[in-house]
Amino acid sequence: MKKLIYIFSPLVISCSSIKFVGNPTITHLTDYVKKEVLSEYEKKFWHLKDLAKDSIPGMSVDRAYKELIKGQKGEAVIVAVIDSGVDIEHPELKGAIWVNEDEIPNNLVDDDQNGYVDDIHGWNFLGDAELENMESVRLQKKEIPGSKAFEKFEKDRLKNIKNKKKELSDIEDIIEQYHESDSIIKATLGKENYTLDEVEIFSPKTFSLMEALIFKRFLNDNLLTKSKLEVYLQEAQNSINAHYNIDFNGRAVVGDDPYDINDHKYGNANVIGPKKKGANHGTHVCGIIASSRNNDNGNRGVFDNSKLMVLRAVPDGDEYDKDIALAIRYAVDNGAKVINTSFGKGYSPNKYWVWDALKYAEKRDVLIVNAAGNSGANIDPGYKKTYITDDVDGEEIVSNFVTVGAVGSSYNNEQVASFSNFGSINVDVFAPGSEIWSCVPQEKYEFYSGTSMAAPNASGVAAVIRSFFPKLKAHQIKKTLMDSGMPLYQEVENPESGELVSPKTLSKSGKMVNLYNALIYASSKSYKK
């Protein structure tokens, strides 16, 4: 008999009229972990699976709904998503978008007198702006050419442009190979449309066909679709043409002063943004949180009783501190109970505005779930600085801020994603963030990786807890996410050094978010106020 190590003792405890009965999910179940490659279905929904039941180290979401929630309806929870804009017309998000009932659509009147005209689903703080500089380039513009500060920024800027040009060339080569391989396979099969299964049964009779098949398998193994390659190509081009272009000014079209926090009469109510394709990131994030649960063909969200408040404040480039601070305040003032912030940058000239907004959210009991970042770096005090953060001179200034790193679907030494930032002080917990399937604009779906995907997974779990335990405070929800999480594999690779380390050296909890455990844990606790 295999020894099962439980996270905490079995609990049968009720909270109000809700009763959750079950054993917390297990960990270190190495003999039962799935060893074969995940099926196509499992790849799409691995983050919702359970280590004990499915041999896949997800967040035990499906198990929680089946064994604990069992059709019970909690309260709807407003989840604000501060991001790049969202395709609110995507079928997956139908019924999941927040509606401001106090505002009359399209009458050009601020009916609820909250300072925002026709804000039916949120607010677009960027107006028609799309591309933007990196913050380092904006700071460089303020320095005197030839000064030490200017030259330091210039050295970094030119280095980044060089790297992006190399990246652009590599992606162009892959896309060219894609088309060549596709043409060879189509000619061999004698058909325009084919499946990977049809490709796999081939025994190549020519070297060119063998190369084409190998390349197709490479693309499939890395979940690289044509549409994803085109997105990566556009991102590289945008980095060269806008992000690191010192002559580019993306803010001019907005019409405000981005360095005056009191200049807040700007933006518009178009939360999609000027182009749907620009809402790729935000749509993917929202799908992770709130796509319909009754769906095996498209996507399944963590909590489809979420009401998504869309706040477009993150351009293609670095966000402005003013936009983020005002977006947080908007979310708080208009009823959000969870705010997802899947973005970050290395410089924050007006960070105090954002810190004041974090404190504002804390006073009003709003939980903020933040992506740790994708540099594979230590973000603890004394190491790499990233913003937004609740770390001020090594001190945590608020209790309602959760920073989330990313893990993948492997329950072994490689569980922590190689790109994920980490830190035993400034990263609180991990969540699934590697190759997450979700919706993207124009009724499509895609796999994406990043702590940007980990944060909404954690936000979804937080929203479920807020739904069924509405009396719990934001700091208590944070404690629940951290304490009830499933411990990571006993030793994992440090993303920066590659050394095997204890998970406790990579985050404060050493755990990944787990809904099944969190429901039981929340039932069990007599929290201190």
Q: What is the predicted function of each stretch?
A:
Residues 17, 23, 332-334, 338-341, ...:
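C-terminal subdomain of the subtilisin-like protease fold in secreted/lumenal serine endopeptidases
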Residues 66-78, 86-320, 396-400, 422-426, ...:
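Subtilisin-like serine protease catalytic core
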Residues 251, 366, 389-467, 471, ...:
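Extracellular S/T/G-rich loop segment that most often corresponds to the catalytic His/Ser-adjacent loop
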Residues 65-73, 276-279, 300-303, 318-340, ...:
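Mature extracellular/periplasmic domains of secretome proteins
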Residues 6-14:
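Bacterial N-terminal signal peptides
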Residues 35-44, 154-176, 328-351, 371:
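Short acidic, glycine-rich surface-loop motifs adjacent to enzyme active sites
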Residues 15-31:
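Bacterial Sec signal peptide processing site at the extreme N-terminus
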Residues 83, 373, 450:
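Active-site glycine-centered loops adjacent to acidic/histidine catalytic or metal-binding residues
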